[in-house]
From Swiss-Prot:
InterPro entries referenced in this protein's UniProt entry, alphabetically: UROD/MetE-like_sf, Uroporphyrinogen_deCO2ase_HemE, Uroporphyrinogen_deCOase
Protein name per UniProt: Uroporphyrinogen decarboxylase
Site (Transition state stabilizer): D77
EC number: 4.1.1.37
Residues that bind substrate: R27, Q28, A29, G30, R31, D77, Y154, T209, H328
Family the UniProt entry places it in: Belongs to the uroporphyrinogen decarboxylase family.
Gene3D superfamilies found in the cross-reference section: 3.20.20.210
Catalytic activity, reaction form: uroporphyrinogen III + 4 H(+) = coproporphyrinogen III + 4 CO2
One GO process term, biological-process aspect: protoporphyrinogen IX biosynthetic process from glutamate
Keywords in alphabetical order: Cytoplasm, Decarboxylase, Lyase, Porphyrin biosynthesis
Length: 355
């Protein structure tokens, strides 16, 4: 077993005792840091940065040099799988991700194969291996993927969407086509995350960014059942240690019980749910991750500390089973010093809850 100097994040996910609440931030390696912008400029563009193991490791470690974070997260993108399936991902200025060959019909779905994690996606595994080496056992490394539903939204819409009309048209007019796509994606995510674990990821997270646009019935049919399949297919022990799995559905507060029933170790919360309510509903079954509004990082240091204190109080005295995080990714124009206030406030203010 690889010795970790700080394993609080892993212990909290498994509801084991810790001496303070561990914290990391979604998108903690990113554009709010000037050093990230410099490294990205050196790489040339976003995907070139992802595909260079040394530079991907550099940007993964940058926030850890600034802040006493309790975990590192692989620097990559959720759209690596569809890109490797041949949909030709590019990032257009002002538009975000665009697929030049989107999925439009059943024939398109039948044509795509499962990418080889050590073939078309080997650059991701190389980054995992490099990051683990460079971390030198300081903190655990989180691997991740998008959920099948969320990946499918980009693949069918051809990029980002506000109304999701194309994928919902497929969902209601050709549900069997969408299920075929989601099933392929679930198999691909299982292979991809298991390869990340074998390469060195010590925990994995599935981001279901767009699950919250579905009706309760459709959420279960088109998103949750495929995340359940992923949880069932993942390696859960590696290098002598359990590999915790976190599921996160943005705007998924109404489905916490169903998410917890998948067999995951932790459920990610966005800021639209009260953490005390979430704990009352599922805290006996899983750990919780979250859940400060990322926009709170625009506030004064005093207000940030006040918000952290309120969330810690909401989680309460039984201080095991909470990983502090934002409710979604940090915004690109947040002052880095405010992120530092946040991280240090979590450590300082959580200690009384862990006596």
């Amino acid at each position: 077993m690889t010795e970790l100097k700080n394993d609080r994040y892993l212990r909290a996910l498994l509801k084991e005792p810790v001496d303070y609440t561990p914290v990391w931030m979604m998108r903690q390696a990113g554009r709010y840091l000037p050093e990230y912008k410099a490294t990205r400029a050196q790489a040339g563009d976003f995907m070139s940065l992802c595909k260079n193991a040394e530079l991907a490791s550099e940007v993964t470690l940058q926030p850890l040099r600034r802040f006493p974070l309790d975990a590192a997260i692989l620097f990559s993108d959720i759209l690596t799988i569809p890109d490797a399936m041949g949909l030709e991902l590019r990032f257009a200025a002002g538009e975000g991700p665009v697929f030049d060959k989107p999925i439009t019909c059943k024939a398109d779905v039948e044509k795509i194969g499962l990418p080889d994690p050590e073939g078309e996606l080997q650059y991701v595994m190389n980054a995992v291996r490099q990051i683990r080496k460079d971390l030198n056992g300081d903190v655990p490394l989180i691997g991740f993927s998008g959920s099948p539903w969320t990946l499918a939204t980009y693949m069918v819409e051809g990029g980002s969407s506000k109304a999701f009309t194309k994928i919902k048209k497929m969902m209601y007019a050709e549900p069997q086509t969408l299920h075929l796509l989601l099933d392929k994606l679930a198999d691909s995510v299982i292979e991809y995350l298991n390869a990340q674990i074998k390469a060195g990821a010590q925990s994995v997270m599935v981001f279901d960014t767009w699950g919250g646009v579905l009706t309760p019935r459709d959420y279960n049919l088109f998103s949750l059942q495929y995340m359940h399949k992923i949880v069932d297919g993942l390696i859960r022990e590696n290098d002598g240690r359990r590999v915790p799995v976190t599921l996160f559905t943005k705007n998924g507060g109404m489905w916490l019980e169903q998410i917890a029933a998948t067999g995951c170790d932790a459920v990610g919360l966005d800021w639209t749910i009260n953490i005390a309510d979430a704990k009352a509903r599922i805290g006996d079954k899983v750990a919780l991750q979250g859940n400060m509004d990322p926009s709170m990082l625009y506030a004064s240091p005093e207000r940030i500390r006040e918000e952290v204190a309120g969330i810690l109080e909401g989680f309460g005295d039984a201080g095991t089973g909470h990983v502090f995080n934002l409710g979604h990714g940090i915004h690109l124009d947040v002052p880095p010093e405010n992120a530092g206030v946040f991280v240090e406030a979590v450590h300082e203010l959580s200690k009384p809850y862990h006596k």
